[in-house]
């Protein structure tokens, strides 16, 4: 068969580090050569014949090896022969080098028995043995074999042992015998101080321990040829430096990891590992194991485990990727000893990173010189563990560190035979051109996982020893094991970029970036650095035939990336990149990034353990970390506890296990210990659960991932989340987990056990994060790295947010430090701070806000409370937060706050009573909720820490405030999410004032007043909670437990008499019971119905249908929906109402306020209120803590974050609250009077917030409210009656928030309001009937929202309180006051002239217009029409729209309400300065009114479509140029389906030239044809047709040329004017000739011979001219068409006559042959002859002539495609 072109990209050409080192893939036994490489070899008859013949030629080589070589070379004889010749030569040398033996550790097969140097007659039998071993589990024979091998090794002199690595790197094994199987214990292998080369990977002993056979270094690693046969690594000892002993072959072990220079210690480790391996004898098919990422099977408690735990160094264990072959079949699990050795289930030998010490003098270029952040290096043996061993890994031991910078790809066959395709360098060819780079060069390797990038990188580094290989994968090598964690992708990329930056600064060259670099943006950081440092940028892709074959890539990549993942990555692969493209690229969409994110993500999924292992390894590092990173500590703790603490054999943690784990933890670093211990119980719970159960484990991973995501989510939303190490961790984890699972709701639901588990999860996360870095360090890094393609995006945001938290945490920690808090205290403190966070976490969105707020609030609450004398109560409560840990009261409130968001999220939260008693309870509950600690305990703990906590509090408050300030800025991002919080919170960002106030007030705090904070939650607390939950403890009155319910918080009073039976059956592993507080079904329903209610309440301007549609489009993700709405500048109804109301209240009562500040203050006060004992807190219906009512209120509040805030208002806090929530604390100057007012207002606000709630007070009111309320909320916020009814129902279920509020006001405040208040109160009962005009007005104003005037007097507030009553009263009102929004007033001024007031001096009062009922009715009708139109998605004219919204704002209520609102608005306006009110109203009106939900939705849909399109096109957006090119392409190929053309165009990366060239090549001619040519061809005779054909061919060729020649693309329409001219001339002469001949014929016919002769001569002349013209045209065509093709060894003969084509062919062939002989290059010439489509009759003429010529001149050629011949140059 014709010789196929050498596969330059094939492995055969890849050279191993040692050119003489031949890596022979171990193949399954000769018996199954084909199966061995099913994917590689084509089982064709000719291939079999070839195999047979070559096997005969190389009889000394194992047929498996021969087959492998053939398959690797694609059965190309020339390629295979080179490799086989080299192998045979190597084999001979091996035999000769008997004096030199390599240390070969042959685990499973006694292949080592015979040294390769020795040829043994038993080879055949050994081969069969090995095959059998490969195919079956290893048996005890292995032990004897190993012994024999060791004996041989022992016989070898020490001096022969050669170590590639300096002895310093080698840990000498103290007891080689240990390492050796007990059977072989009698043997003492010679381990010289010199490094012995172990085939570490061979450690996979099924039943036998690794046997280290120290063969002389120069001897081939494995036995004789048979060994080579089976194991594909024959290293020539001649080049010890190059020979990778490390790549010694394990005959039996499918993966051979050459452990070059292992110490005895290492050997011991190996021994122990082997011993451990013995325990897991089940052979595992690589296929099965491959998908799993390298697992660290660290510390199975196996006898071997007790051995030396020193992790072998990477240098000690040197694993060249090339040298590994493994037979996937049989990898018994080798438990790593104490994690000293990490096993890669993938069984892919992983190259080890050299240790930090300077690379050994004879370092192998194959091994990256970079050291991981961890110094320990361990021996890696691929291990496939049985399921049982899977879990029972003991994490107590520090993981061994083996750094594989570039793990080799896993080569495995489906049948488990070692279809050993040496991925990276199966066989090194004798001749390989060295690629040396001159100058400063940056080499960016690009390729999919498994394509050979790492090998190429090592090869380049070998050729350029001064170069350095930088791979992001290095980041994930912990203890020598590749442990990918997507959470750290961004961090890893950033880390790698920092390394690259250092390399650039050091002028290292070449700098080889060994990343996938799928897309341009991924390379941008490196290219930018190269540009900065004047480096030349080279892009290199592995020249492997499988680089774009997902199946083969999946088989070859060492990280177990699945085919599907690789396929997705391939879809995103940007094939054409250049520096300009890269520099102009931008980071893609998150999702895409995540998709593009390192394939290794799948590695995680492959082995549930990876995370844990990673964590466990991290744990080592983490353990060393101090708890100052509480968050991490906690997470670590979880991880540690989970991984480290869980004994391998612990299926379920018993108390003993817990203790044991504790001990283990104690073994860990004390610092972590403390954290762990704190968390341990929790961890135990979570650990035992998650860890012990695979599902749990996977869940944990998920949780981790989710948690990470959650964090990213939550973090994004709340930086605080992570700040609270334990609390946040616990809740967050849980929440994160929940987020992953059931959503944030579960956090609240989660029992302490849950929390613990969460915490554990978080801890785990933290651990995962803390590979070697402190959380704080890493998080910033995360923030820094917003990488996405290879790194997840979610996290970045979360981390960024988190960074703020960290700041908080840091501050808290610092404060802790200042006060020398024990770490546990720190935890508590951070937790307390985090409590907010945690609570916040409850609703990630809000949590950030709350966290910040809560901190600020904590500070501000005291401030406010101080300001307001309520400060005493509040102070007490708010300062309860003192040491980072809020005191019970503040905690309760704060928790509520945070929880409120959660509730908003429809997560039921334990709402704690506002009273001190309640606070206490709430504290306990809150603590329990957060910590699962009983309130009593918390108190006790807190009390112990009280003083310090106070100090901390002040300090921390300041710090937290600072953080808050920071966060407040950052808060905006999370605000949209926090919509669940009161809208005002969202709208208001904490302003520096708040901080200042907090700080100012801080001093005011009276530590004595504060409640003690608990620093630590004890397991008993969780147990107590658990028992309470399980009703196992009799309930005492001392504890009041509020259980969150969707239908409202109804306090479940547990009279907890902590009996002695408290200890009864306290599960030490408190499990996370998802249904602890709320059933999942409830959660689900809560999510949907609650979230919809929340959305409707928050965004009343949109119809329920629209919101529901948006909610569904957002996959029922309320956070997403809310974010969309907020991002679209839609303000929350509550927000607007509250703002307006607040303005009014503040204006009248408090005066101007900065909404953001006030919001925070209010929030803090809200917390304070809740905390404060004053009945007012009860009033805080929003808090819903005080009573069942309050709970219901809470629910309502949930519905309305506003309510939550309103509830926060207390008489004391009221003012601050007012500032925050106008509605919440409608500026109550007099706590009593104002409070009633504020309460009313709050109620009103609540009502507003809850349009439905307002009316919910009474069913009648509800119905009416529905009518009115549809408009009530914010003018724009129009709730459909159904929505309101829902709200009302919700309110009712919550025991009618308003009623509750009213009750609260009445009860707690004893609403001492003006007579109005009682009225209002009564009105609460019957709002409609009792409402005053003022009240109505206020309601109107509030409801109007946009028209709301800033100041509302108590009356007004009262009015506001009763919007519906306003309607009832409206019947008796003759006229109404309409408060015009400033915008509308200005517009009216402009449109219809001035009204006698200077627009500049316009005040709120001036904007009040008295309108009669008729006009009001007209306005109402118009308003209604506008609403209907909006709902119909019909845009109203701008003017009308402006008016309507204002009308909506003002007339939103009934006319009477409008009137009252006018009055109220007047009052408010009066109170507030116009400037203050106007901007707010302006801002509000502008944002809210001008954006409709439909617009937002349409935008979002369009945006989503755009993103989807981007995703589809790999982030490629069609710009104008691309579209023009596309159109041009359609013109060029009009006959081809445009969709097909678009696909082709896309496949060619939107390169018109390439696309056209490809299509021309495929079509063999241009679709465009010259009509004239065709006509002439058809008209004329053969000559004419021939000429026409030529010209036709020429023209098509020109067109094709045009298409093919990029430079000429612009002239496609008129590219060959000369050609056209020539052809026209030829045609003209042809016509003339035909005319002359016809005339001559006619003259001859009539007898005029002279005339006939003349015409004949003329015709002849014309024919000559025609030929000349055609010749010129042909020359022109040839030159133009082939100008760009000839350099590429392509000859296009289109458009030429046969003779011309042959002439050019001869000339070009001769020229190219000479060039090839002199300069090399392509050994072939592609000749495009065309298929004859343009020839007359469609019959090809050039092609047959060319073929005939080639045959006659003995050229070898093949027709690669129709019309294209590939001619091999001689």
Swiss-Prot record:
Region (Disordered): 1-40, 95-129, 712-756, 795-822, 836-862, 890-913, 1580-1606
Phosphoserine sites (modified residues): 906
GO molecular function, one term: ATP binding
Annotated positions binding ATP: 447-454
EC top class named in words: hydrolase
Residues carrying Phosphothreonine: 1210
This protein's UniProt keywords: ATP-binding, Coiled coil, Cytoplasm, Hydrolase, Nucleotide-binding, Phosphoprotein, Ubl conjugation
Domain Smr per the UniProt entry, residue ranges: 1691-1770
PTM: Ubiquitinated; this targets the protein for degradation by the proteasome.
Stretches assigned to the CUE domain: 46-89
Pfam family, one: DUF7817
Main location: cytoplasm
Biased composition range(s): Polar residues: 97-108
Annotated EC: 3.-.-.-
Compositionally biased region (Basic and acidic residues): 115-129, 843-856
InterPro entries according to UniProt: CUE, DUF1771, DUF7816, DUF7817, DUF7818, Endo/PolyKinase_Domain-Protein, N4BP2_CUE, P-loop_NTPase
Location(s), subcellular: Cytoplasm
Cellular compartments per GO CC: cytosol
Chain coiled-coil ranges: 90-177, 218-259
Known function: Has 5'-polynucleotide kinase and nicking endonuclease activity. May play a role in DNA repair or recombination.
Entry comment, domain topic: The Smr domain has nicking endonuclease activity, but no significant double strand cleavage or exonuclease activity.
Quaternary assembly: Binds NEDD4. Binds BCL3 and CREBBP.
Name of the molecule in the record: NEDD4-binding protein 2
Native organism: Homo sapiens (Human)
């Amino acid at each position: 068969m014709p010789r196929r072109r050498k596969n330059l990209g094939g492995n055969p050409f890849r050279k191993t580090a040692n050119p003489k080192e031949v890596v022979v893939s171990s193949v399954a036994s000769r018996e199954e050569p084909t199966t061995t490489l099913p994917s590689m070899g084509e089982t064709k008859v000719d291939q079999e014949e070839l195999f047979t013949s070559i096997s005969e030629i190389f009889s000394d080589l194992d047929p498996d090896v021969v087959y492998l070589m053939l398959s690797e070379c694609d059965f190309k004889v020339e390629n295979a022969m080179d490799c086989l010749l080299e192998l045979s030569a190597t084999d001979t040398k091996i035999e000769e080098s008997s004096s030199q033996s390599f240390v070969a550790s042959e685990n499973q097969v006694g292949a080592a028995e015979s040294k390769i140097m020795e040829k043994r007659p038993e080879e055949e039998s050994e081969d069969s043995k090995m095959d059998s071993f490969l195919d079956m589990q290893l048996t005890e024979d292995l032990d004897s074999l190993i012994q024999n091998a060791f004996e041989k090794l022992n016989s070898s002199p020490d001096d022969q042992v050669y170590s590639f690595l300096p002895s310093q790197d080698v840990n000498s094994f103290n007891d080689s015998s240990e390492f050796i199987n007990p059977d072989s214990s009698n043997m003492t292998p010679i381990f010289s101080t010199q490094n012995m080369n172990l085939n570490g990977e061979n450690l996979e002993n099924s039943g036998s321990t690794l046997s280290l056979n120290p063969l002389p270094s120069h001897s081939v690693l494995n036995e004789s040829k048979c060994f080579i046969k089976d194991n594909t690594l024959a290293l020539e000892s001649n080049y010890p430096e190059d020979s990778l002993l490390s790549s010694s072959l394990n005959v039996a072990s499918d993966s051979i990891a050459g452990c070059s220079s292992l110490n005895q210690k290492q050997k011991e480790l190996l021994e122990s590992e082997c011993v451990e391996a013995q325990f897991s004898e089940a052979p595992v098919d690589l296929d099965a194991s491959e998908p799993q990422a390298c697992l660290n099977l660290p510390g199975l408690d196996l006898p071997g485990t007790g051995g030396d735990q020193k992790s072998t160094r990477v240098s000690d264990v040197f694993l060249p990727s090339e040298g590994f072959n493994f037979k996937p079949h049989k990898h018994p699990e080798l438990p790593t000893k104490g994690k000293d050795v990490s096993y890669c289930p993938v069984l892919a030998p992983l190259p080890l990173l050299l240790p930090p010490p300077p690379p050994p003098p004879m370092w192998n270029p194959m091994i990256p010189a970079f050291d991981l952040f961890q110094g320990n290096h361990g021996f890696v043996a691929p291990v496939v563990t049985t399921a049982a061993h899977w879990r029972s890994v003991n994490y107590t031991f520090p993981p061994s560190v083996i750094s594989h910078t570039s793990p080799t790809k896993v080569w495995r066959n489906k049948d488990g035979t070692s279809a050993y395709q040496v991925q990276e360098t199966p066989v090194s060819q004798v001749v390989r051109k060295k690629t040396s780079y001159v100058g400063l060069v940056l080499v960016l390797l690009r390729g999919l996982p498994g394509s050979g990038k790492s090998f190429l990188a090592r090869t380049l580094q070998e050729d350029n020893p001064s170069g350095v290989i930088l791979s992001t994968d290095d980041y994930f090598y912990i203890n020598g094991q590749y442990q990918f964690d997507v959470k750290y992708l961004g961090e890893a990329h950033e880390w790698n970029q920092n390394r690259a930056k250092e390399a650039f600064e050091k002028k290292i060259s070449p700098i080889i970036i060994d990343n996938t670099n799928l897309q341009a943006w991924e390379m941008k950081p490196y290219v930018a650095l190269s540009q900065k440092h004047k480096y030349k940028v080279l892009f290199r892709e592995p020249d492997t035939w499988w680089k774009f074959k997902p199946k083969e890539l999946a088989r070859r990549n060492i990280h177990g990336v699945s085919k599907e993942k690789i396929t997705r990555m391939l879809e995103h692969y940007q094939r054409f990149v250049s520096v300009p493209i890269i520099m102009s690229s931008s980071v893609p969409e998150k999702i895409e990034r995540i998709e593009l994110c390192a394939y290794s993500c799948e590695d995680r999924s492959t082995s549930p353990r990876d995370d844990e292992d990673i964590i466990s390894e991290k744990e080592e590092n983490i353990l060393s970390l101090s708890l100052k990173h509480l968050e991490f500590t906690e997470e670590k703790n979880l991880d540690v506890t989970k991984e480290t603490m869980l004994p391998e054999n612990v299926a379920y943690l018993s108390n003993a296990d817990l203790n044991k784990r504790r001990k283990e933890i104690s073994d860990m670093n004390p610092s972590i210990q403390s954290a762990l211990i704190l968390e341990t119980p929790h961890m135990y719970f979570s650990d035992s659960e998650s860890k012990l159960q695979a599902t749990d484990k996977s869940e944990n991973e998920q949780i981790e991932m989710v948690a990470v995501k959650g964090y990213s989510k939550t973090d994004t939303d709340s930086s605080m989340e992570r700040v609270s190490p334990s609390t946040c961790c616990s809740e967050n984890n849980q929440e994160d987990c929940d987020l992953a699972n059931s959503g944030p709701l579960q956090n609240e639901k989660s029992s302490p056990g849950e929390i613990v588990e969460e915490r554990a999860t978080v801890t785990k996360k933290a651990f995962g994060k803390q590979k070697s870095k402190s959380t704080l360090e890493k998080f910033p890094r995360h923030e820094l790295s917003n990488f996405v393609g290879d790194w997840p995006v979610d996290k970045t945001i979360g981390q960024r947010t988190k960074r703020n938290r960290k700041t908080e945490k840091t501050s808290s920690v610092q404060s802790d430090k200042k006060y020398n808090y024990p770490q546990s205290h720190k935890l508590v403190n951070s937790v307390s701070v985090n409590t907010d966070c945690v609570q916040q976490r409850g609703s990630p969105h809000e949590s950030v806000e709350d966290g910040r707020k809560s901190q600020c609030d904590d500070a501000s609450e005291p401030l406010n409370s101080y300001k307001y004398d309520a400060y005493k109560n509040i102070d007490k409560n708010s300062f309860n937060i003192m040491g980072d840990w809020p005191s019970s009261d503040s905690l309760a409130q704060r928790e509520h706050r945070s929880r409120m968001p959660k509730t908003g999220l429809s997560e039921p939260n334990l709402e704690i009573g506002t009273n001190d008693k309640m606070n206490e309870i709430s504290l306990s509950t809150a603590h329990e909720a957060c910590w699962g600690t009983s309130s009593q305990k918390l108190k006790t703990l807190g009390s112990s820490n009280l003083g310090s906590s106070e100090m901390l509090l002040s300090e921390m408050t300041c710090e937290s405030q600072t953080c808050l300030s920071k966060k407040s800025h950052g808060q905006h991002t999370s605000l949209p999410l926090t919509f669940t919080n009161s809208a005002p919170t969202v709208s208001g960002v904490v302003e520096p004032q708040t901080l200042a106030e907090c700080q100012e007030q801080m001093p005011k705090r009276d530590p004595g007043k504060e409640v003690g904070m608990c620093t630590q939650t004890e397991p008993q607390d969780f147990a107590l909670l658990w028992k309470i939950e399980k009703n196992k403890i009799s309930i005492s009155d001392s504890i009041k437990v509020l259980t969150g319910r969707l239908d409202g918080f109804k306090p479940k009073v547990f009279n907890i008499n902590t009996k002695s039976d408290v200890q009864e059956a306290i599960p030490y592993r408190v499990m996370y019971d998802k249904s602890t507080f709320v059933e999942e079904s409830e959660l689900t329903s809560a999510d949907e119905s609650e979230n919809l209610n929340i959305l409707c309440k928050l965004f009343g301007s949109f119809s329920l249908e629209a919101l529901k549609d948006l909610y569904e489009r957002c996959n029922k993700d309320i956070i997403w929906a809310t974010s969309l709405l907020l991002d679209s500048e839609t303000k929350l109804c509550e927000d607007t109402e509250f703002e307006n109301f607040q303005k009014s209240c503040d204006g009248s009562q408090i005066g101007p306020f900065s909404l953001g500040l006030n919001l925070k203050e209010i929030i803090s006060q809200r917390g304070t209120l809740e905390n404060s004992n004053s009945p007012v807190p009860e009033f805080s219906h929003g808090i819903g803590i005080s009573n069942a009512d309050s709970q219901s209120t809470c629910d309502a509040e949930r519905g309305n974050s506003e309510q939550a805030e309103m509830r926060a208002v207390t008489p004391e806090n009221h003012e601050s609250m007012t500032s925050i929530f106008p509605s919440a604390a409608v500026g109550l100057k007099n706590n009593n009077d104002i409070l009633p007012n504020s309460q009313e207002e709050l109620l009103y606000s609540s009502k507003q917030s809850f349009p439905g709630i307002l009316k919910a007070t009474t069913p009648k009111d509800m119905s009416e409210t529905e009518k009115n309320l549809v408009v009530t909320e914010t003018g724009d916020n129009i709730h459909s009656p159904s929505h309101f009814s829902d709200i009302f129902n919700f309110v009712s279920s919550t025991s009618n928030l308003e009623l509750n509020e009213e009750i609260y006001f009445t009860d707690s405040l004893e609403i001492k309001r003006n007579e109005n208040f009682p009225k209002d109160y009564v009105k609460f009962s019957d709002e409609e009937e009792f409402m005053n005009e003022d009240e109505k007005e206020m309601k109107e104003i509030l409801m109007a929202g946009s028209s709301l005037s800033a100041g509302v007097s108590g009356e007004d507030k009262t009015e506001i309180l009763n919007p519906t009553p306003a309607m009832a009263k409206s019947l008796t009102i003759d006229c109404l006051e309409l408060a015009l929004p400033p915008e509308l007033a200005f517009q009216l001024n402009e449109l219809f002239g001035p009204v006698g007031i200077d627009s500049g001096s316009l005040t709120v009062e001036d904007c009040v217009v008295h309108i009669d009922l008729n006009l009001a009715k007209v306005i109402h009708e118009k308003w209604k029409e506008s609403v209907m139109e909006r709902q119909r998605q019909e845009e109203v004219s701008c003017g009308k729209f402006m008016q309507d919204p204002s009308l909506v704002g003002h007339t939103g209520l009934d006319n009477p309400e409008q009137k009252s609102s006018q009055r109220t608005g007047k009052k408010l306006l009066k109170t507030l300065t116009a400037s203050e009110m106007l901007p707010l109203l302006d801002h509000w009106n502008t944002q809210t009114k001008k954006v409709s939900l439909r617009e937002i939705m349409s935008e979002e849909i369009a945006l989503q479509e755009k993103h989807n399109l981007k995703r589809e096109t790999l982030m490629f957006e069609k710009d104008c140029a691309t579209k023009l090119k596309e159109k041009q392409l359609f013109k060029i190929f009009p006959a081809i389906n445009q969709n097909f053309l678009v696909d082709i165009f896309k496949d060619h990366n939107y390169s018109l030239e390439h696309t056209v060239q490809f299509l021309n090549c495929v079509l063999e001619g241009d679709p465009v044809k010259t009509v004239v040519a065709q006509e002439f061809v058809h008209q004329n005779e053969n000559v004419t047709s021939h000429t026409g054909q030529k010209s036709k061919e020429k023209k098509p060729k020109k067109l094709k040329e045009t298409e093919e020649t990029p430079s000429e693309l612009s002239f496609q329409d008129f590219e060959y004017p000369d050609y056209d001219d020539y052809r026209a001339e030829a045609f003209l002469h042809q016509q003339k000739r035909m005319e002359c001949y016809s005339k001559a014929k006619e003259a001859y016919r009539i007898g005029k011979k002279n005339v006939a002769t003349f015409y004949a001569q003329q015709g002849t002349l014309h024919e000559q001219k025609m030929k000349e013209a055609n010749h010129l045209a042909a020359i022109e065509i040839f030159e133009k068409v082939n100008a760009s093709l000839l350099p590429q060894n392509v000859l296009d003969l289109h458009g030429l006559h046969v003779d011309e084509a042959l002439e050019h062919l001869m000339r070009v062939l001769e020229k190219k042959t000479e060039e090839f002989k002199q300069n090399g290059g392509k050994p072939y010439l592609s000749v495009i002859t065309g298929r004859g489509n343009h020839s007359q009759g469609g019959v090809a003429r050039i092609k047959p002539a060319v073929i005939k010529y080639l045959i006659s001149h003995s050229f070898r050629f093949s027709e690669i495609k129709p019309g294209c011949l590939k001619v091999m140059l001689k």
